[in-house]
Amino acid sequence: MSRFFHAKEDSDSDTSSSEDEVEDQKVNKSAKFRDDLDFMAGPEEDEKRVVRAQKDKKFDELKGIIKQNRDAKSNKDLNRLLTGFDSLAKAYDKSKTVFQRQNVANPRFYIRSLVEIEDYVNKLWDDKDAKSALSKNNAKALPPLRQKLKKYIKDQQLQDLVTDYRVNPDEDGYETPEDEDDDDFGEVSESKAEKSPGKPSEKAAVSDSDSDSDDDDSSNWSSEPESNSSDDEDSVTKMEQLRRYFLKKEFRVESKDDKKEKKKRVIRVKEAVEEDDDADWTPVNREKSVVHFDPKEEVTHDVMIKKLNEVMSARGKRTTDRNQHVANLRKLLEVSEEKELGLGINVKISFCIISALFELNAKISDHMEYETFMTTLQTVNSLLDLLIGTDRVKLSVTYAEEDENLKDDTQEYRIQGSILIAVQRLDGELAKILQNADCHSNDYIEKLKAEKDMCSLIEKAEKYVELRNDSGIFDKHEVCKVYMMRIEHAYYKYQDQNEEDAGKLMDYLCNKIYTLDDEKRLRQRAMLCHVYYLAVHDKWHRARDLLLMSHMQAIVDHSDVDTQILYNRTICQLGLCAFRHGFIREAHQGLSEIQNTQRAKELLAQAVGTRQHEKTAEQEKIDRSRQVPYHMHINVELMECVYLICSMLLEIPHMASCEFEMRRRMLSRSFHYQLKQSEKASLTGPPENTREHVVAASKAMLNGDWKKCQDYIVNDKMNQKVWNLFHNAETVKGMVVRRIQEESLRTYLLTYSTVYATVSLKKLADLFELSKKDVHSIISKMIIQEELSATLDEPTDCLIMHRVEPSRLQMLALNLSDKLQTLAENNEQILEPRTGRGGYQGPGSWFPGRNERQGDKQKGSGGYQGERRGGQGQDGKRGNWGSQGGQQRRHPQKPRAF
Amino acid sequence: MSTAVTITAPSVKHILLDSLVVMKIVKHVDSELHAGISEVSGDACAGVLTGLVFLEDSRLEITNCFPTVRNEPVMDDDANAAQQYEEQKQHEMLDMLRKFRTMNIDYEIVGFYQSHQFGAGFSHDLVESMFDYQAMGPENVVLIYDPIKTRQGQLSLRAWRLSTAALDLASKNDWRPELVKAAGLTYQNMFEELPIIIKSSYLNNVLMSELSLAKSCSSDKYSTRHFDLGSKKSLEKSVRAMMANVDELNKSIQSLTKYTIDKQRHDNMVFSLTQKRQQENESRVARGDPTIPMDDIKRIKAPQLQTRNGLLDELLASFDTNALADFSKTVTSENITKMFIAEAVAEEKVAGTKDRTLSSVSSTR
């Protein structure tokens, strides 16, 4: 502690030589004072720290009263002095408990004040002249005051202190000596506080080392805890503040004799203070902070462990410089390796280093520095290597701290901790780093390289787990997590060559989790990843069956947000997979769940929603932390395009078939929206983006012009934006063109059936460049499904149209049924009156879009769950997926059936 | 409508209808229908029923009837003309009753008859006249005759009267939703139907049995006329009428919805205002100040149902729709039965070929 004062003196000495004297005195005094206080306060420092504020309050209170007393004294107002003394005694009585609890002795300024009053009263008492000169009131007050004082000092057993003080009184020149005293006090306690923050247990460690140092009689040791606690910039600034406080007071002292110069000095002193702010301080600290052992002493296990404990005790403290902390640990590791203290210690220290590295940034939401991440990765890697290399070290969370065996060579080393959790945390940090990197910069690619290292590390961890799984050191959950991490690093990657192996690996990993995991969450996630992986690799049937078997669509609403995001991603990927396989309806169903919401990006966690006003900063932060790193993104534009193409293929024939129906049922709202938008435009130019391409193609198809439609869908621009993104682009393109031909034929027949009485199949085949057999099959199917009222005439190869107009009664009946429907709707509304737009949604709810938007309005901030499937639309959608199986069974026959 | 009406519960359980009355009604309505008068005037054929009440058998005997004079179309909007007609009508009715009396026919009015297609013509006016008649004599009923059914070879006569609850509401002419709800009135229990027994004279009965035994007429029994599906037109008409009723229902339901919402809002408002006022008054009492009366709150106007007759229209529309639906149902089911029979017959005659041309009605989607 004295170090500070010396240093301060140094820095002050150059400001003004005239101050030196005062300074010196003060320093001496405070040092002395501190010493005896220290002695008294020794054993229970920490408790005092807790209630410091209270103590200060009491001090202030006392000082205020003393000040009043002094005023009264100088005014010779004995009456006021008497009451003042009473209140002082009372206040002191009250605060005594506080002092006692904090082990503060009777404050010196209090004693001084008592002595002063006593002296004054005695003087008055003795001085007959002065006494007679007193006013009547004052004269009355004097005897009781004197008696009270005497009695009080006697009662409180303050005689010793008073006599002590008399022997060694404060200088008379002080104007406000008690202030200074208090400051000394404050400083002492403050420096104590610095010395011993943190939890009591750490406290104990420090005091332990303290006592140790006493025993050892080693000067180095004794300075250790202090240097530890004070090597921080924080403490420096704090000391700095203290010093300023001192300096200011010095002016006050000075001001007595030299008021004119005062201002100048202030500036000068302040300047000086600022000058020597850091420059002077930091180097001193650094020098002292390095961990070192006494060269004379042999470094044994015990010493090392003690040292480690000591260093670790600084962990997590506000005042600890984290970088320094890591460096200290590193040093320890070096020493321990040097002295060959055994693996146990090494592993323990390494593990401490890893956790220290993780703690380098204070906030959990902040991401790690990339460099730190790499070092951490390496550290973990080497530790893992070490652990794999030997089976004598057991690192497990199941051990308690007391069970640790760090030194005993003959037994296995047992250390508390989990390397797997470290790996997991590292993985999380990587995700955070990638989330926070600019995804369009080279920087991102640089950082992405770490992903590979991470993968190999996880692989290594898995190897380690499989190696040591029998020894029972792993928690089941931990093991699951390791497998899960591997899955999560693999599921979205497309592997072209030796696909079989990769698929097997995925199966293996997922099966591990299916068997190991007790809680459902990981199993669900693994299942979704599995489905995703299968979908990416074009294993449509397996992927779909797995998803349907998992019943995820039924439970996903009740699962956590991350799983929901994964589910959304999986659904989209599955939809794309179905599209590649030509299962247009399935693809449409899969994609519409996400695409119809108009917030696909948000639902896939690839962008944060723009509606800030609905979200608090907190929520926004959470949302941000959930974002999927860029390299895992699903191409939303591609998805939208695929969705629109699917919609086109399904919707256009549908539109043609119910052109005259009063109520059109829309399959896809967003597709209709796009169509309507383009119809609204007064001038339709050539299509620019993919969306416009599809819309233009749809219009062409509606007119039955399949060639134009095809040109819009398959061209250079679309190749670049859409088709080249498929790994089997040519097959997909072929499939789409073929579907366009078929659907155009259907649309053509439906739209123009009224114009024809008969059509030759050959002509149709020529028109749509399909084989006659295909045309035949398509037409037959339409006839069977009662879409087209016509018959095929085999001998002439003609399609004969039948014109059936509904009879009047039928029309009327249809009208009536419509009316009844509205009646039913209105009726429902009576049962459940609702204001606003929300109303009975029964008949409309096969279409999710409408409800979705309503849902948004109702619970905009409901997180991913509410957003994705608002309102009552979900049941309908759920049904869709469920029924998909049935449709699917029909589906494979489609190309062959006719 | 008089306000002070004592409503006595009717004690009649069934109706004994003289065949004479049936014949007279059929003749009256059919002739008018043929002449197309009802289409011109837009009014239903109507007449007065006379007879007597047998309280000990709780039976109403209707023994005679006579048609009332039709309103002649009023050329100018002469306010006096309508009144004159009314007087004239009244006068003729009294005159007829007097003649009945002199001829020793039952001259006590026991109700009235009206013809309505499909038996569904319950309008506000009809309810009003039913109330008038029932107020006059508690046992009075209305006979609704369906000329369409007659055309199809069946006789449809149904006797109705207003239920006590409906009568109660009609006496106040207040069909507010709350009251209707409190009375537990639905379209099903608004009207009460009474079973009708048609009584022919013995001479008649003898003639009938002789006719049925006579050989010359018996071939008629098996004529193909029974297979006639010529109900398409009437079905169309009934569907059309149903649509009109459903439209009506829709309208009233919408206004009812609006009313419920408004009412709820109003109730809430009044409640909160009252509570506030009560609190204020309590504090005023505590202070010794005079209390503020609640009059202004009570004066806040409650929302009104936006239909003319409260829920009455809705009830009537429901009732009519029900009747129409019944009609359609019976006709279609009959037709389907006929078709099956026809098919079977046809198969017997021309083996092998099924003729589906008859199935025009069934081919609804």
Swiss-Prot record, chain A:
Comp. bias (Low complexity): 219-228
Main location: cytoplasm
Keywords on record: Cytoplasm, Initiation factor, Protein biosynthesis
InterPro entries: EIF3C, EIF3C_N_dom, PCI_dom, WH_DNA-bd_sf
PROSITE patterns cross-referenced by the UniProt entry: PCI
One annotated Gene Ontology cellular component of this protein: eukaryotic translation initiation factor 3 complex
Basic residues compositional bias, start-end: 888-898
Gene Ontology molecular function terms on file: RNA binding; translation initiation factor activity; translation initiation factor binding
Acidic residues biased stretches: 11-23, 170-187, 209-218
Subcellular localization: Cytoplasm
Keyword Transport attributed: no
Domain (PCI): residue spans on this chain: 630-806
Biased composition (Basic and acidic residues): 1-10, 24-37, 189-202, 850-859, 866-878
A GO BP annotation: formation of cytoplasmic translation initiation complex
Subunit comment: Component of the eukaryotic translation initiation factor 3 (eIF-3) complex.
PANTHER family tied to this protein: EUKARYOTIC TRANSLATION INITATION FACTOR 3, SUBUNIT 8 EIF3S8 -RELATED, EUKARYOTIC TRANSLATION INITIATION FACTOR 3 SUBUNIT C-RELATED
Family: Belongs to the eIF-3 subunit C family.
Summary of the function given for this chain in its UniProt record: Component of the eukaryotic translation initiation factor 3 (eIF-3) complex, which is involved in protein synthesis of a specialized repertoire of mRNAs and, together with other initiation factors, stimulates binding of mRNA and methionyl-tRNAi to the 40S ribosome. The eIF-3 complex specifically targets and initiates translation of a subset of mRNAs involved in cell proliferation.
Name under which the protein is recorded: Eukaryotic translation initiation factor 3 subunit C
Organism: Caenorhabditis elegans
Gene: eif-3.C
Swiss-Prot record, chain B:
UniProt similarity note: Belongs to the eIF-3 subunit H family.
Biological processes annotated in GO: formation of cytoplasmic translation initiation complex; translational initiation
Quaternary state and interactors: Component of the eukaryotic translation initiation factor 3 (eIF-3) complex.
Secretion signal, residue range per the UniProt entry: none
UniProt gene name: eif-3.H
Keyword Nucleotidyltransferase: no
Residue stretches making up the MPN domain: 15-166
Gene3D superfamilies: Cytidine Deaminase, domain 2
Keywords, sorted A to Z: Cytoplasm, Initiation factor, Protein biosynthesis
Organism: Caenorhabditis elegans
PROSITE patterns: MPN
Superkingdom classification of source: Eukaryota
Role this protein plays: Component of the eukaryotic translation initiation factor 3 (eIF-3) complex, which is involved in protein synthesis of a specialized repertoire of mRNAs and, together with other initiation factors, stimulates binding of mRNA and methionyl-tRNAi to the 40S ribosome. The eIF-3 complex specifically targets and initiates translation of a subset of mRNAs involved in cell proliferation.
GO cellular component: a single term: eukaryotic translation initiation factor 3 complex
Name assigned to this protein: Eukaryotic translation initiation factor 3 subunit H
Pfam families with a match to the protein in the record: eIF3h_C, JAB
Location of the protein in the cell: Cytoplasm
GO molecular function: metallopeptidase activity; translation initiation factor activity
